[in-house]
Every structure is written in C-alpha cells, then in structure tokens.
Amino acid sequence: MGKKAGVPVPLMPLEHPLLFFGPLPEAQGAEDFLVYPLLRDQGNSAYVRDTGRLHGGMLEWGYYEDKNPRLVDPEDIGNPEKTMGSDSMRYLDLEEVAEPLEKAFETTPILNELGWDEKSSFNGLLSVTPDAGSLIGESPEVRGFWLCEAVWVKDGPGCARLCAESMVNGKTQVDMHSFDIARFYPEQKEKEFVKSRAFENSQTIYTPAVHPREPYISSREKYVSPFYEREKELGGFFDNEVACWERALAYKSNEQKLDKYLKDIPVREN
C-alpha cells in the first residue's frame, strides 16, 4: 500500500516461530482465563505463554532467532507456496528451531509432556525497523497518509492512542521522536539500509542485551565529512553516526590531556 501511494515504509518483516503444545488439562472448563503466567527464557531467546481458555488452553512457545534471523522480502508476503491460511502465517520448518526447542524442553518439560500441535504451529511475521522503533504518524511524503506500523502486542494500545491523538489533536502527550515516521531521512529509507539494520536489530530482540546507544555495525560510512581522513589520523572514535553521517565522539590524540583535566572530571559513584 505504501508503494502504491508513494510512501516508503522503512521496515522488514521477520519470521517468528510459534509452536503450540497441549491443550492443558487444567484449562478445560476452568473459570480462570489463564492457568500459567508468561515465562521469558532470556538465555534461550524464547518465551512460553498460556494462550488462555478462550484460545484452546494451549501453551505457546515463541522463539527469536538471534544468529540468522529470517527476514522476509515484502514482495514475498502472501506467496501461496509459503503461507497457510493467512499472509502472516508461514509454514514452519521444525529443523530451524530444533536446538532452542531442545533447550526449552529442559527448562519447561511440560511442553514435551503435552506434545506438539503441528497443525496449529507456524511462522508468524513481525515488523522490524532500522532503529527497532515503531512507525507512527503522518507520512512526510503524502499528506493524509497515516501509519501505525511495527507495533508489537505489548505496545498496541499505547501506539494506537498516540496515533489517534496525532490525528485528532495534532500533538500527543508524550515525546514522539522515537516513534515518529518522520524521524528517518531519505537515505535511511533505502531498501538495503533498512534490510541491514533490521537484520542487526533482529539479532538482539531478546539476547544478548545491548546498551541503548550500542553502535551499529552495518551500513556505516554512507556519508563522511571532508576532514574524515584527518579525524581518523587523530584517532577518532567513530562509535556512532547521525543521519548516516559518521561523527567522532572523541580523539585518541587528546589522551595526553587527561593528566591535566582528569581531576576536573566528577567521579560518578553510581
């Protein structure tokens, strides 16, 4: 739809394996909506959750591939050879998740006891952006074209509210910078840039934990200043970039000045 309207949408679909086990005997006829709480298995990049009595009382095991995430070309969404019932439900290859699934059986043996429901299991699709944030707001390219994309379950209600507030009031109650679709420059909407950054972000959805300012490795040196080579000679630390421009945060050539100024730098105990 974005392509037809002339609106670039900087995101990549990502396959998300969803395996179902059960049903849970405890859920049959139970008054409680849920029997078990959600378990997040950080070390295995996976989670286990109770789907609820109204959804068959199954246990859902979801996995985030942290080594070779399987991005899906937008043109391939809806490929009848790869989908089952819905464009966002793709066939699951059990071999792709065999190793983490074995670990899950050790951590949560109830999965093995209940048994795998093959017919209900599939690869879902998630949306991942170049900076792992959602895309909310009016398109900079086409007036009146609004987006609320790359929104995951836990963020759905809040993102919907922000989008509605933007439409009705022209502003929101919170700072929209990290969600606003307009935060991306044209170069950051190019397909290869989006794909490489989305792949990198997909590797760290659950594990390993990364610092919010962790520098990106992919799609670097797109733009450099005329004095970039000189900055490198001075030992520039190009740990980050701004709008695709390389920017040095510090210079090794200034290291000798620590003796003079270190005493003026406050000590942070925490």
Which residues does each PLM region occupy?
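Short, basic and Ser/Thr-rich N-terminal targeting/leader segments
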Residues: 41-44, 130, 241-245
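C-terminal catalytic lobe of FAD-dependent flavoproteins
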Residues: 43, 71-74, 83-208
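Generic structural signal for residues positioned in beta-strands
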Residues: 18-20, 47, 60, 135, ...
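Flavin-dependent oxidoreductases
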Residues: 1-91, 102, 107-114, 192-201, ...
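Short, well-ordered strand-loop elements centered on a beta-strand within folded domains, enriched
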Residues: 55-63, 144-147, 259-263
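A short alpha-helix-loop-beta-strand transition element characteristic
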Residues: 8-12, 170-176, 237-239
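Glycine/proline-enriched, intrinsically flexible loops and inter-domain linkers
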Residues: 186, 191, 195-270
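Short, glycine-/Ser/Thr-/acidic-enriched flexible segments
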Residues: 26, 53, 66, 141, ...
